[in-house]
Curated annotation (Swiss-Prot):
The keyword Transferase does not apply. The gene is clu. Belongs to the CLU family. Keywords: Cytoplasm, Phosphoprotein, Repeat, TPR repeat. Residues 1009-1019, 1470-1487 have a biased composition (Polar residues). The keyword Cytoplasm applies. Residues 111-126, 1020-1040 have a biased composition (Low complexity). Its main location: cytoplasm. mRNA-binding protein involved in proper cytoplasmic distribution of mitochondria. It is found in: Cytoplasm. This is Protein clueless.
């Protein structure tokens, strides 16, 4: 195995062709092994049917019988990764099948994690049985799927291992031999073997050969596992693998943020796999909710966030397993075959020294004091260390068997590594044990990979650029390319994060060590690192440190959009921005040759001094002009230092450098998009009265404010719709005028008649023209929805206008051109006769001298400026109101600051407008929850600015004390006593008072903006933050060298909240009307635990998992020991799977058309492609799983929905976080499907978990809480827990009344549920009153004849009857003065589970409309009769209706051929999914 891994790394280092240790390929290749092997599941695992349940397989059979080509595309998923692996092996990526082993650790770990990835990929890889798009659909969406090339053949082989039963495995013929290695290392019987070869007929198989290429391999062949001699390297791999097996259940790595491990608690909460559960009877369910879940909790506790942590670790097999101090073997022992020595302490407290030799492992006679390498007597040599330890320790043998059983019982998704590290903001106190391998990783392995790649470290730039150069013409090529890009990018992010932490921790030597620490730059592992400071006054005119701090983020945005455009021949740098310990670090790949020359010699395009000197280059103009068409960037000319015009197709700061490899690189993309004039005070710009009345322009602390790409797209779309409308109006007028002129000579008698005819003609033509307008509008919207690379070009827009002109029969081209000219002038087009909306990013840049070219038209520069101003005005006057209006329906309400920020960004609204958003929200009571979330986010962001400042002024010795003190000042009003003696503070301050401020001012004031050529190429905005003027002095004293002070000890709760108020006012222009945490909580309804969570995630703090008393008046809430860790906050660009995205969007379109089954198949294929690109574990995979689960449920397969949604929950917990908003949403969906499958108790537990997480994140006052409470109440009602049920529904009703109003359908349902519960409790009077409210709402909203209104009326009648009967009996009692013996008991009939499920579906936005077969036949006959009549009568004006009817008939006919299976929820039915606020909440109709 050593040779294979070394071969892989050598090839990767040599070529860079996707050869990086990666995440995906081991998962993908191995997934096909298991997905094709339904008869032989991995050890201890249940049989996974192609990533779905057996129900999915049945459904897949139907689809395959109907459409054979789909099966071939499904096979593509299995075949692709193996075919690519072979192709990659030629290109130097030979061992990608083993990439997962090397990716998450060094390869000595063995393949345990990769084998876990195998099963996970098998689970998700072909969910829905690979239902693919047909060839026609693929072609329609631009796919060029070569089904023949993706054809695959299965083969069954027997594997014979020493000491184990013969194993029969079904594999793909395109699998690599290496896949069998992975499979064996994951199985319980063979997992302890790492050093072995596979032989067929005594011939050793090449690990990187495909099975179909092996001579003599046929169905039923037996492959033997042969133990191989150890080398030093193989022995280390084996020891590391044993260590990983022993700590497999230990969550310590997930809490510590190591090796891309992360947490999931679903299986803990459900106490096992939901698919293995049996249906529960309602009377056997324990439904008592925890106290912290019942409505009315003031502050949710923290401990339930991590349930059952005491039992998570598993049994301990050994006390110590470490390398011996007798290492390395002396010369004489090397000649006897000794490789290394180990030291073991067993649970029986026996100590052993173990020798590793080429034959295996044995006990030697050494002690701690005496070296005696001879074998112990009696000697016992084992090829596996596990066998030896089992022989000498019975406790080890028992514990190891238990660990293995629990390991193999875990869900496959719990074992596979995530693509990026997910950090936990709270963690328990972890036991720190002896671990030599952990110590070796921390100190011996400096770069992580250099001892594994012969001759050199990884050339990140070469790998990143080579993967982008891979061919992309066919689907297999694109999948290979995207997988390679994703693998290398993931490794680069991991390495950059590790390097940035090492830089801040002081473990990397600077390339300019003699300069001020703020000015130092670093190169580590072929990555360039720069700190976030304005070191050379580079940003002096733009805001200094403030500008330098945000510049890397804007640069990252620029890299993202240029990567998305993906112009062949145009290259960007690998870029990652890391915030760690208060510092911002930018990590970038290095352009070849940049370190060998000066900056002036390197840059051939752009400017290095903000426009004083400007260069251009024909090749860059060609490439950037192509990119600019998609990004709406206007080519423009500026004057250089010699007053010569220079053409640019980007901002002037964008630099072009041709590397020694001949590639054309662009960097410094911080001004890719135009500036935001609302936050710039410019002399020659006058904003509109509406904006000035709102307080704009606001002078921001830096001048790099840019508009977002999403805003520009929305703005252009809005202007295009206006342009079409104006053009249509003018064309109508011309046409009407022309018609009137025609008719005028023939009319001589009546003067009124021409007017009448003209009016009639205009009105007759109006619908047709309106259709044209709507059609153009829909086309534009359709074009504007995809990525920026698919935005409609200006030429296409003009063609659409010309087509509209011809459709309305305007023959006079001169007049038509005049119409277009007027419309262009009205909307502000840059060209007089074309719709042209592009933006000049330099139009307001200071110091730039523009050339107002005559060919662009008169006043072109003024038009460009006006366009940028209009876009900024559009943001404030249209986009912000549209954002608020969209959330008024509460269809997908943000839950925390992160989801709020994402929603703002999707509308093109920058976070700096959050103050303005809050002002508008404050006037809307129904948006109270969003107002509160926005204020919380504002406080957290302002506090982050201040926190960074103080962290920079804190020396490492006092980090935990400083952080805990800061949290005390932020979240409490009790005593805050810094854990530093006052004597030490005064001593340090008096020592530092003299010269610390002067040192910062020793910056080199030379003309060059950078100190080295590396910096010239890469550093362009990496600076520290400063919270406000009063805080800046602390930042100026900070350095990474330890020249720190104790300013943080002077912070008090009062001073901190004063700084927060100032920061919010200066940055967001909003007044925070409170000066302490208590007043903030009282005024805005904030929860301290929510603020703690949000702040820790924002800045990277991990606190101890315990209950915190925030209102303690006697001792500080946080102590030094409560700060467990500090982790990095990483920003990077996530690569995209374009083909999978196309399949997904096509599937969504099918769903919106009501074709649920076709949509299901397309999204299943999207999931297969995502699994090929990203591996088994990724956020986008989770979105596909959620959609597939919902579709399965709508199609009547609740069991399949449960299986898929369970995987979606685990995936969301692992890749997003255990308390992420998406995870909460997944839990609520899973609870519904659990109930539908009869798991009533589990459904309640899942809802309790979702409610706890939701309240922890945002508090009880939220529309989503109302939804969850309604679900809980309904299920408790079904179980007879009426009092508990009433508490939840009362809270839900209160929230629904607040957020939806008195007449909303949500409120009607809540009143109805409350009436049902109260009637069961015998409170008929209250029930009657509540049902009256329901009836009133239904009557006003739906009318008296609606079914819901009639049902409510019938319910009122029954309740009235029961209430009268009960009152009559009570009156008898009162009149007689005593109880009568014949008073009948109140008969309470609990609702059936079917009726409860129906109501649950209604609450969650799912409505099943049942249609009998007789109804379908009747409807079909009526529609066909109508169609026949319309055909006989000739052309029908109502073409759309006719087409819709034909589609409906086809759908009914389709449904007749494929009826849902028995027991399904929808039998020959139409399933309508109403809006439910989730991503997949689209109104759909499926026959």
């Amino acid at each position: 195995m050593a040779l294979e891994i070394d071969a892989k790394n050598a090839a990767a280092a040599a070529t860079g062709d996707g050869g990086a240790p990666g995440k995906a390929k081991a998962k993908e290749n191995k997934s096909n092994s298991n997905s094709n092997n339904n008869n032989v599941p991995a050890a201890g695992e249940k049989n996974l049917v192609n990533g779905s349940s057996a129900a999915t397989k049945k459904k897949g059979k139907k689809n395959r019988n109907k459409s054979p080509p789909q099966q071939d595309v499904s096979a593509a998923g299995a075949a692709l990764s193996n075919g690519h692996a072979e192709k990659a092996s030629v290109n130097g990526d030979a061992a990608d099948a083993n990439a997962n082993v090397l990716d998450k650790k060094v390869e000595e770990e063995g393949a345990t994690a990769a084998a876990g990835a195998t099963e996970a990929a098998a689970e998700v890889g072909s969910s829905g049985d690979g239902g693919a798009a047909t060839e026609g659909e693929a072609a329609a969406s631009g796919e060029d799927v070569d089904l023949d090339a993706l054809h695959d053949v299965g083969i069954t082989v027997n594997i014979s291992s020493p000491g184990a039963d013969v194993l029969s495995v079904q594999l793909s013929s395109m699998e690599l031999v290496q896949e069998i290695h992975q499979l064996l290392m994951d199985r319980e019987e063979t997992c302890h073997r790492t050093c072995f070869s596979l032989q067929l007929d005594n011939v050793t198989l090449d690990n990187f050969a495909e099975l179909k290429t092996i001579e003599g391999l046929e169905q039923g062949s037996t492959i033997r596992v042969v133990e191989e001699p150890y080398t030093m390297r193989e022995a280390r791999i084996h020891v590391r693998h044993v260590r990983d097996l022993l700590k497999n259940l230990d969550p310590a790595d997930a809490y510590n943020g190591i090796d891309c491990t992360s947490l999931t608690y679903l299986i803990t909460i459900t106490q096992g796999d939901l698919l293995d559960k049996k249906r529960t009877r309602p009377d056997s369910v324990d439904c008592t909710p925890p106290d912290y879940v019942i409505p009315g909790v003031r502050e949710p506790p923290l401990l339930p966030l991590h349930p059952n942590i005491k039992n998570a670790k598993g049994p301990q097999a050994l006390k110590v397993l470490t390398t011996s101090a007798w290492n390395p073997p002396p010369g004489p022992r090397k000649l006897h075959g000794d490789l290394m020595y180990l030291y073991v302490v067993t649970m029986e407290d026996k100590r052993f020294h173990i020798s590793a030799c080429s034959k295996g492992f044995y006990i030697n006679q050494s002690t701690d004091e005496c070296f005696n390498p001879k074998p112990d007597n009696p000697s016992h040599l084992s090829h596996s260390l596990i066998d030896l330890l089992s022989h000498i320790s019975p406790s080890f043998r028992r514990a190891f068997q238990t660990i293995q059983k629990r390991r193999t019982m875990r869900h496959a998704f719990e074992r596979v590594a995530t693509p990026y590290q997910v950090y936990q903001w709270s963690a328990p106190q972890l036991e720190h044990t002896v671990d030599a391998i952990r110590a070796e990783d921390a100190f011996s392995s400096k770069l992580g990979y250099e001892e594994h790649i012969p001759g050199q470290t990884r050339d990140w730039n070469e790998e990143l650029q080579t993967t982008r150069e891979l061919p992309r013409k066919t689907l297999p090529e694109r999948l290979l390319r995207e997988r390679a890009i994703f693998k290398v990018h993931g490794d680069f992010v991991t390495a950059a994060t590790r390097g940035a932490m090492a830089v801040i921790d002081g473990n990397v030597l600077a390339i300019n060590p003699g300069e001020d620490p703020k000015m130092q730059m670093f190169i580590w592992n072929n990555i360039f690192f720069s700190l976030g400071f304005d070191v050379r006054d580079h940003y002096k005119e733009l805001g200094g440190d403030h500008a330098a701090f945000v510049a890397p983020r804007y640069d990252l945005h620029g890299v993202r959009v240029y990567n998305a455009v993906d112009i062949e021949g145009l290259y960007t740098l690998g870029t990652v921005v890391i915030d760690y310990r208060g510092y911002r670090v930018t990590a970038q790949s290095i352009i070849p040759g940049i370190l060998e020359r000066e900056q002036e010699q390197s840059v051939v395009y752009g400017s290095i001094d903000f426009g004083k000197t400007v260069l251009s280059h024909p090749k860059y103009l060609e490439l950037l002009r192509l990119a600019g068409k998609h990004l709406k960037i206007l080519p423009h000319s500026v004057l250089n230092e010699r007053d010569e015009p220079v053409e640019l197709c980007s901002s002037v700061e964008c630099k072009g450098i041709i590397g020694n490899d001949g590639r054309h690189y662009i960097l410094d993309l911080l001004r890719t998009f135009p500036p935001d004039v609302n936050f710039l005070k410019l002399q020659d710009v006058q904003l509109s009265k509406e904006l000035t009345d709102m307080g704009f322009p606001i002078e921001h602390r830096h001048k790099l404010c840019c508009l977002r790409q999403e805003l520009l797209e929305a703005f252009i779309e809005d202007r295009y719709v206006t342009f079409i409308r104006i053009a249509a109006v003018h064309l109508q007028q011309l046409n009407a005028k022309k018609q009137a002129e025609k008719e005028l000579p023939s009319i001589t008698e009546k003067q009124e008649e021409p007017e009448k005819e003209q009016a009639e003609k205009s009105s007759a033509e109006q619908p047709e023209k309106e259709k044209e307008k709507e059609k153009d509008k829909e086309d534009e919207q359709k074009e504007s929805k995809p990525s920026p690379t698919e935005t409609k070009s200006a030429e296409a827009m003009v063609n659409a206008i010309r087509e509209a002109q011809s459709n309305v029969a305007v023959s006079n081209e001169v007049q038509a051109a005049e119409v277009v000219k007027r419309a262009c002038a009205a909307v502000g087009s840059l060209k007089e006769k074309e719709f042209d909306f592009r933006f000049n990013p330099d139009v307001f840049s200071p110091g730039i001298r523009h050339v107002d070219s005559p060919e662009s038209g008169a006043q072109s520069l003024a038009k460009q400026k006006r366009l940028v101003q209009d876009a900024a005005e559009f943001l404030v006057l249209k986009q912000i109101p549209a954002f608020i209006k969209e959330h008024m329906a509460h269809s997908s309400p943000p839950i925390d600051g992160q989801s709020l920020t994402e929603s703002l960004h999707s509308h093109g609204i920058n976070v700096r407008y959050l103050g303005k958003v809050i002002k508008m929200l404050s006037q809307m009571p129904r948006m109270d929850y969003l107002h509160r979330i926005a204020i919380l986010e504002l406080i957290v962001r302002a506090t982050k600015h201040i926190y960074y400042t103080y962290m920079q002024s804190t020396e490492p010795l006092h980090l935990s004390a400083a952080i805990s003190h800061f949290l005390n000042c932020l979240l409490t009003t009790g005593p805050v006593n810094p854990a530093v003696s006052s004597e030490e503070v005064h001593k340090k301050q008096s020592r530092n008072n003299g010269g610390k401020h002067n040192k910062h001012n020793k910056s080199n004031k030379s003309g060059k903006p950078q100190s080295t050529s590396a910096a010239a190429a890469t550093q362009n905005g990496h600076s520290s933050t400063a919270a406000n003027g009063s805080a800046n002095s602390a930042a100026n004293t900070a350095s990474t060298s330890g020249n720190s002070n104790y300013d943080w000890t002077l912070v008090t709760p009062r001073s901190l909240w004063q700084q927060i108020r100032k920061e919010i006012k200066s940055y967001w222009n909003w007044e925070l009307d409170c000066d302490s945490i208590e007043s903030a909580c009282a005024k805005y309804g904030l929860l301290r635990i929510s603020l703690l969570r949000a702040f820790c995630l924002k800045v990277g703090i991990q606190v101890l998992l315990r209950e915190y008393n925030f209102e303690s008046k006697h001792k500080p809430t946080f102590g030094d020991d409560d700060i467990v860790n500090v982790f990095p906050v990483v920003k990077h660009i996530s690569p995209r799977a374009t083909d999978a995205y196309n399949f997904y969007t096509t599937g969504q379109a099918k769903i919106q058309q009501g074709l649920l089954k076709e949509g299901y198949e397309l999204i299943s294929e999207a999931l297969n492609l995502l699994n090929n690109v990203f591996g088994a574990m990724h956020q986008e995979n989770g979105s596909c799983l959620r959609m597939l689960a919902r579709l399965s449920y709508l199609l009547g397969d609740a069991q399949d929905a449960l299986a898929i949604q369970q995987r979606a929950v685990i995936m969301s917990e692992r890749v997003n976080g255990i308390d992420h908003p998406s995870t909460i949403l997944e839990y609520t969906h899973l609870s519904l499907y659990s109930f539908a499958n009869g798991h009533v108790g589990m459904s309640l537990k899942l809802l309790y978990r979702a409610r706890y997480l939701l309240v922890l994140v945002c508090g009880e006052d939220h529309p989503e809480v109302a939804l969850i409470d309604s679900n809980i109440s309904l299920i408790l009602h079904a179980l007879g827990e009426y009092e508990l049920s009433l508490r939840f529904i009362e809270h839900a009703l209160k929230l629904n009344l607040k957020y939806f109003g008195n007449k909303a359908m949500h409120v009607a349902v809540s009143y109805h549920l409350m009436a049902r519960i109260q009637s069961c409790m015998g409170d008929f009077r209250s029930a009657l009153n509540n049902e009256k409210e329901t009836y009133s709402i239904y009557k006003s909203q739906l009318g008296e004849k609606h079914d819901k209104t009639r049902e409510s009326a019938e319910c009122l009648r029954l309740l009235t009857h029961e209430a009268v009967a009960l009152q009559r009996k009570m009156n008898d009692i009162y009149s007689n003065g005593k109880l009568t013996s014949d008073l009948p008991p109140i008969h309470i009939t609990p609702p059936s589970m079917g009726s409860v499920l129906e109501m649950l579906n209604t609450i969650n936005g799912i409505l099943f409309v049942h249609i009998s077969q007789k109804d379908i036949v009747k409807v079909r006959s009526q529609i066909e009769k109508h169609l026949k009549t319309s055909d006989e009568s000739g052309p029908n004006d109502d073409n759309e209706v006719t087409a819709a009817l034909k589609t409906f008939v086809a759908a009914i006919n389709y449904n007749d051929t494929e009826q849902p299976k028995e027991g399904s929820e929808v039998e020959g039915a139409t399933a309508t999914q109403l809006t439910n606020g989730s991503e997949d909440s689209t109104t759909t109709v499926s026959s």
